[in-house]
């Protein structure tokens, strides 16, 4: 069985990016001495599944930051060739979250990092998320792209842990209840 796991930062008012996708408010708080648990989180993940918006944002970084395979779920990118530098690292697919996980299960994948606001919402709506690590950044944006959208029903969570960092960020780890 493939399990999916979320690791994401949000503003105090619940946004993951400005309306135009800008994450300057997050990047300016980047402290290379604090990894906020990311290394431990990603260590046991076999694959990363992200949405188009996250993929396009990561393409603007100086270097490709991932050392494991990435599946980009997007109807718009399905027929787009993978950039030469990312061949063997990235695949595009228009499959649904459930179908994508079934495909990965056939490849003997066990644990997957889910990244990207809309994609996280899709996985949540389908009941496919095992746990969420949310790092809250002490800034109010007032508007932007929310982490959570409309859900068909309440999703109960159990707090597994919570900690704060010297930079003022607060991280909470939740397990989703069945």
Task: Describe the predicted segments one by one.
Residues 1-178:
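Enzymes that bind and transform nitrogen-containing heteroaromatic metabolites
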């Amino acid at each position: 069985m493939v399990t999916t796991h979320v690791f994401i930062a949000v503003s105090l008012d619940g946004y993951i990016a400005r309306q135009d996708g800008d994450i300057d408010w997050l990047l300016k708080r980047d402290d290379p001495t604090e990894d906020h648990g990311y290394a431990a989180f990603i260590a046991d993940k076999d694959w990363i599944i992200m949405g188009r918006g996250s993929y396009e944002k990561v393409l603007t970084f100086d270097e490709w930051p991932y050392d494991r395979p990435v599946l980009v779920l997007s109807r718009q990118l399905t027929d787009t060739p993978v950039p030469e530098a990312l061949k063997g690292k990235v695949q595009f697919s228009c499959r649904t979250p459930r179908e994508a996980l079934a495909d990965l299960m056939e490849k003997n994948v066990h644990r997957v990092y889910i990244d990207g606001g809309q994609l996280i919402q899709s996985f949540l709506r389908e009941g496919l998320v095992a746990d969420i690590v949310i790092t809250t950044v002490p800034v109010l944006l007032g508007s932007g792209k929310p982490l959570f959208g409309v859900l068909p029903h309440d999703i109960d969570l159990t707090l597994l842990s919570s900690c704060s960092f010297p930079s003022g960020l607060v991280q909470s780890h939740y397990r989703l209840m069945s």
